[in-house]
Curated annotation (Swiss-Prot):
Homodimer. Binds to stalled ribosomes, contacting rRNA. Endonuclease that is involved in the suppression of homologous recombination and thus may have a key role in the control of bacterial genetic diversity. It comes from Staphylococcus epidermidis (strain ATCC 35984 / DSM 28319 / BCRC 17069 / CCUG 31568 / BM 3577 / RP62A). SUPFAM superfamilies: DNA repair protein MutS, domain III, P-loop containing nucleoside triphosphate hydrolases, SMR domain-like. Belongs to the DNA mismatch repair MutS family. MutS2 subfamily. This is Endonuclease MutS2.
Amino acid sequence: MRQKTLDVLEFEKIKSFVADETISDLGREKVQEMAPASNFDTVEFQMNETDEISQIYNKHRLPSLSGLAKVSPLVHRASIGGVLNVAELNRIKRLVQVQNQFKTFYNQMLEEDEEVKYPILHDKMNHLPILTDLFKEINETCDAHDLFDHASYTLQSIRSKISRTNQRIRQNLDRIVKNQGNQKKLSDAIVTVRNDRNVIPVKAEYRQDFNGIVHDQSASGQTLYIEPNSVVEMNNQISRLRNDEAVERERILTELTGFVSAEADALLIAESVMGQIDFLIAKARYARTIKGTKPTFKEDRTIYLPNAFHPLLDKDTVVANTIEFIDDVETVIITGPNTGGKTVTLKTLGLIIVMAQSGLLIPTLDGSQLSIFENVYCDIGDEQSIEQSLSTFSSHMKNIVEILQDADQNSLILFDELGAGTDPSEGAALAMSILDYVRRLGSLVMATTHYPELKAYSYNREGVMNASVEFDVETLSPTYKLLMGVPGRSNAFDISKKLGLSLNIINKAKTMIGTDEQEINAMIESLEQNSKRVDQQRIELDRLVREAQQTHDALSKQYQQYQNYETSLMDEAKEKANQRVKSATKEADEILKELRNLRDHKGAEVKEHELIDKKKQLDDQYEVKSIKQHVQKKKYDTIHTGDEVKVLSYGQKGEVLELVGDEEAVVQMGIIKMKLPIEDLEKTKKKKEKPTKMVTRQNRQTIKTELDLRGYRYEEALNELDQYLDQAVLSNYEQVYIIHGKGTGALQKGVQQHLKKHKSVRQFRGGMPSEGGFGVTVAELK
């Protein structure tokens, strides 16, 4: 896109605002590189990229990118044998730290809401390298200022020697400065440092009293800084140790630089990705300041910008306008007062196109739609503040000639006051001829004009729409409101009347312009009112459609969650049913064992194969198929009482005990009796029964799965509870309900304490609202 267009539309100011939102030089470099793309896939990708980060930015607290800096020059120097210092190593460490923190934040965000997907950001996170070892090496070796003493054994030993030697020097010099005989000879009773040597400040006249080396003197020459001979050798030792320390520091830094060099490619990837993240977050921050929204890009020639406003104008006073090229409209001509905001409308459209194709969210309501243009051409100048002259006309015409040479069907052209600066009749004719030419090129065009001849231009040409900016005759000022589809009308009579011009003069003037023009003005006024009403209705309709779509999406999500929950409940119910059958099978094994003992010891006439056959009948009740895997049921004859059936929803076999009407049946599945829909039953072939000799066992009394203790005294209730639990265990109940009511809570407390101690109770809990709430305790039996 032409740089001249970007300059006229002030895109650099937009980039400046985005750059202000970045944290690092990496992000600012990305902003400076930002420019409108023209490839459809590229533009759409950039917009989706920004939208993803904006969604995250608006919903979450992002980790800080503070300290993120460019490291590629350091990595390059490390790769060619240079040695990095501590500060430079810390810049690399901070890059790794920032990328790790952001990746951790991203993973935690996904765990909180697994259904939300950010495919573009996810891909960036997958590209971030693992640099844990490098971070650990740097972090354990140095801080922001220097190498740690423990960076190596040698360094620790050297620094320890330096510390001990310094301490001896200090002690020696402290004795000298604290000696009473030396007090008057010293400028100050302190130990100081000159040329990296420990010295004392001696008055010049007492130089001969101190044997040592003079390292410096004061500006006045009255103080000499002397290193006493008693510490010279110790200071020499420190100098040697300092040299040893420097050598060891260089060795350690060289080693760390080697680690950096080994991860050079990974560090460059991390720098690139985190620079992009900084850039995208800056876009998101700027989007929030202008309440930016994501447009939908269309392959066809479409522009629809609901309530668009210029992002560089004051948000509190700027007027938002809906700009659109509807149906087959290719040219929009805006007429109206010179100060009515026509130029702002042109710049708003052009700048929004440039922003969108640069991957920036745009200042409109939701629902905007845009084509992607190869080029946006502008002929916009401040025609209102300079005198119209030949030179002005020539300047504009030169620009227009360049535009017409390059424009094509993939161009958007913005003409401000087309044909102005010359004779009105010639200017209007030129304007119409130029519009005809660009229409033949296939370009989309928006042009402003104050020539009345262009109002009629759209009526005898297809694909051309009039528009105007509204003027308030009450306040005698423009409202800056754009009216699409409505040509501008003259307000001279209304303004004159408002200013007090005689009605006789106004009426006489009206007779001079003819009835047709008066009717046209009246028609335009009516169109203005209708246009405003339709515009408001359109915006409201768009809002309702968006809300309906959001509701639809939310309900679809809830429905899917419900289906998953329902399937989970069914599988859980199947598992519980199988557990009950398994428990019954275990009990049957115990019974068979008792029967065998009876047979063996008392000679009961029961044959082994008969016992096994009965056991198998109970085993046949148990299936492990998932609810999701049940097959389509086979229909045999009509189901009758006594038939053996398979319950499809549970995957269990049972016997029909009773038919309830034509649609339901009572079925016994092992120890479970349930009322089920007949359509959920599949008739199975009944096995032939062999005559068997029966060993009878006394039936236990049938009890309910609930015990109502309301009205009982405390001791009576606990006795009743003990008896009930024993019977429930014998009946192989896995879960029972103890109804104690709410009352004062004493009985509830007593029941629960008793359940806690009872040997047959595995655990207990308070009742759910559907089970009776606090008035019920649910006990699970062993």
